[in-house]
Amino acid sequence: MNRLGHKSVVYHGDLRLGELDVNHVSSSHEFRFPNDEIRIHHLSPAGERCPPLAILQTIASFAVRCKLESSAPVKSQELMHLHAVCFHELKTAVVMLGDEEIHLVAMPSKEKKFPCFWCFSVPSGLYDSCLRMLNTRCLSIVFDLDETLIVANTMKSFEDRIEALKSWISREMDPVRINGMSAELKRYMDDRMLLKQYIDNDYAFDNGVLLKAQPEEVRPTSDGQEKVCRPVIRLPEKNTVLTRIKPEIRDTSVLVKLRPAWEELRSYLTAKTRKRFEVYVCTMAERDYALEMWRLLDPEAHLISLKELRDRIVCVKPDAKKSLLSVFNGGICHPKMAMVIDDRMKVWEDKDQPRVHVVSAYLPYYAPQAETALVVPHLCVARNVACNVRGYFFKEFDESLMSSISLVYYEDDVENLPPSPDVSNYVVIEDPGFASNGNINAPPINEGMCGGEVERRLNQAAAADHSTLPATSNAEQKPETPKPQIAVIPNNASTATAAALLPSHKPSLLGAPRRDGFTFSDGGRPLMMRPGVDIRNQNFNQPPILAKIPMQPPSSSMHSPGGWLVDDENRPSFPGRPSGLYPSQFPHGTPGSAPVGPFAHPSHLRSEEVAMDDDLKRQNPSRQTTEGGISQNHLVSNGREHHTDGGKSNGGQSHLFVSALQEIGRRCGSKVEFRTVISTNKELQFSVEVLFTGEKIGIGMAKTKKDAHQQAAENALRSLAEKYVAHVAPLARETEKGPENDNGFLWESSEDVSNKGLEEEAPKENISEL
């Protein structure tokens, strides 16, 4: 219940506007303006599509300090004008109080108590930055670097890992495990040789081809900063870059592995020059190293401009927790409007962990095919999750918050304000009982160095000029086992493709080995090398646990297959949690699991070829199947949102079949054409043929052109499904015997199994922007 407080004089600059009564919103907390003067500093930018009350409820929920109204018998014309300008132009009157701003929001009144305002308190600068993001339908995304986007090694870290693997191999008796570790050892040694040639001569031989270092100028990020020119060798076909953190010190040379599918994620974030996300980096690495790694990831500075780079790349101490508040220091974004992409959740503050989408750690040496064999690479999954989060956030903002805000009046109680959207509501944490999207066991040694070693070795290298200590490497402290999330697209590849996911050795069923010389976190992952400990002289009791295919989770914890990412411009209906989120489904042969075979159900088609539109899935949860055997849950929509009334879903299906076919054609790089032909049937006056790269794959005849299109697209999908099943069935039968005889594990065959999966793309924007 509001209660009368006191009067305050309102000024705009030095101009006196009149007096307003200050009504407290809580009897336990009385707010007073200094000297009982309300000095308006400026008016905020116009909200355009966003009313100020909706913005403030999003970034400062229920932070109403007081209410202002006029009790004067004759209303001040200046105050009435201020109220009218703020109300109709979607602005606020801003009072500066130290590090906070008091925003006067012009309110409608049931009792016509004009002028009247609600006063919100927010950190200085936060309102303007969040207003800009909400107007442009933009959120923030924070990336980790090491083992999330890149893996980097120096000569020293390569030598440590090579010696550790040699020690394990010398104690191993199982020839299969020896072969697996030997293959991993060879990968380390090959890259070490590349790095050594680069350090010694500024060139390297790759498969007999001479690659000379090319000078790359690092543009200064601030005035007065000296230009830096680094010798760089790029091997794009291997996602590998050789660079030097400090060009004058050769021992700061680093071999960097860039995670596959990064380009797809990067292009989604900046598609059509319209920012969907403001990008930040939070890492435990040394700053020069972090800046160079990000330059390799974003060479054109499209994601983070040069003038913003110093503020947006945040380096925290290795023993400290990451925090969104520290990332957004200065009030540039509210944590409720931000999500995180990281391979570890526990390195973040507890309050930020619900906003973290966990990706599997990037392991290019331990499991080199873990990325390429997936139907949907890990970073494409992260892109889909980001798309879902953004779509649901603004869906709730537009259709729930803003519609409710329009019904709020000055006389209403503050505690009755509608809840605001929060990114944490849409980043759904996965069942920890299984690893999603082909996640594999963590390797016994980190792929790159960790923690504060980076800065220590850089400083030592600089002091010794040409010392043997490396400059930098994988600098992230990784204190706990990953906890993946279910906001993923299923990788329902054939068993032959799934086999290619594994390292080239069988997994161990033994317990975790003791790894002398490493420190461990609660989750069992090695954190970093202890200073002064040489792992080459340590006694390693056991070889590493090798990777195995993740076990299929219980049916109760699994979502039904199908669905697709929410197109962020579709603005789908929010059902309480994001749809289109799936666990991984790799076949296995352990007792009690589903049998291994080419297809246990027709719906086990590749999800990126056919997937379900979000609205149709909610209205048809039973997963009705078409006559051709394609589950409607697997049809993908790349266009507008579809609505169906009860059983009358024909209109939605028409667009669904056509858009699914176009999606398949786009992913295959094939042209899909609908050609109208003359019908010889008097009743069915329209006839449409579907051509797939010139080949006719379907025909439809109906009384209307729309129905003919639908029928033709549906028949074409059936034809493609039959061809697909006929193609993958022999491949699946070849591997059917192996998993049953080997306790459900799939081994990599001696021949390379090519991944013929269709490349995942960012959601196509073919409708009007949000």
Swiss-Prot record:
Keywords: Activator, Auxin signaling pathway, Cytoplasm, Developmental protein, Hydrolase, Metal-binding, Nucleus, RNA-binding, Transcription, Transcription regulation. The keyword Chloroplast does not apply. It comes from the Eukaryota. It is found in: Nucleus; Cytoplasm. Residues 753-770 have a biased composition (Basic and acidic residues). It catalyses: O-phospho-L-seryl-[protein] + H2O = L-seryl-[protein] + phosphate; O-phospho-L-threonyl-[protein] + H2O = L-threonyl-[protein] + phosphate. Its cofactor is Mg(2+); Co(2+); Mn(2+). It holds the Pfam family dsrm. Optimum pH is 5.5-6.0. One of its GO terms (cellular component) is cytoplasm. It is an enzyme of class 3 (hydrolase). InterPro entries: dsRBD_dom, Fcp1, FCP1_dom, HAD-like_sf, HAD_sf. Interacts with RCF3. Component of the ASI1-AIPP1-EDM2 (AAE) RNA regulatory complex composed of at least AIPP1/EDM3, ASI1 and EDM2 and may contain CPL2, AIPP2 and AIPP3/BDT1. Associates with the BAH-PHD module that contains AIPP2, PAIPP2 and AIPP3/BDT1 to form the BAH-PHD-CPL2 complex (BPC) for transcriptional repression. Binds directly to AIPP2 and PAIPP2. This is RNA polymerase II C-terminal domain phosphatase-like 2.
